[in-house]
């Protein structure tokens, strides 16, 4: 769970951002002014499985097909950690309530 610890601290440091969110495969979320989207679309979901993304468009899914919590702009969850839009769409619907 070292990876999760580092992600948690990163999320905490970004909590001042309006769109900061950590989304999990179960659909629960931590953050403000946001709508969770089950951790992604097309992946197995869950922290260890594939689906943790941060609301700033960061893709931390490690190469899975799931998308980040907030749509990830043009990156579409290829695991490269690219920055995308913070208010994109997820599974065809709105994913960030900002």
UniProtKB/Swiss-Prot annotation:
Ranges where the record places region Disordered: 1-21
UniProt-listed Pfam families: Coiled
InterPro entries: HssA/B-like_chaperone, HssA/B-related
Gene Ontology annotations of biological process type: sorocarp development
Assigned protein family: Belongs to the hssA/B family.
Protein name: HssA/B-like protein 39
Species this chain originates from: Dictyostelium discoideum (Social amoeba)
Underlying gene: hssl39
């Amino acid at each position: 769970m070292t990876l999760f610890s580092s992600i948690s601290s990163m999320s905490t440091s970004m909590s001042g951002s309006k769109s900061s969110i950590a989304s999990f495969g179960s659909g629960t979320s931590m953050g403000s002014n946001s709508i969770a989207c089950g951790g992604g679309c097309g992946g197995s979901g869950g922290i260890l499985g594939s689906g943790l993304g941060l609301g700033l468009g960061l893709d931390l899914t490690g190469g899975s097909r799931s998308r980040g919590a907030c749509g990830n702009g043009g990156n579409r969850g290829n695991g490269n950690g690219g920055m995308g839009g913070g208010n994109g769409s997820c599974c065809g619907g709105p994913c960030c309530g900002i």
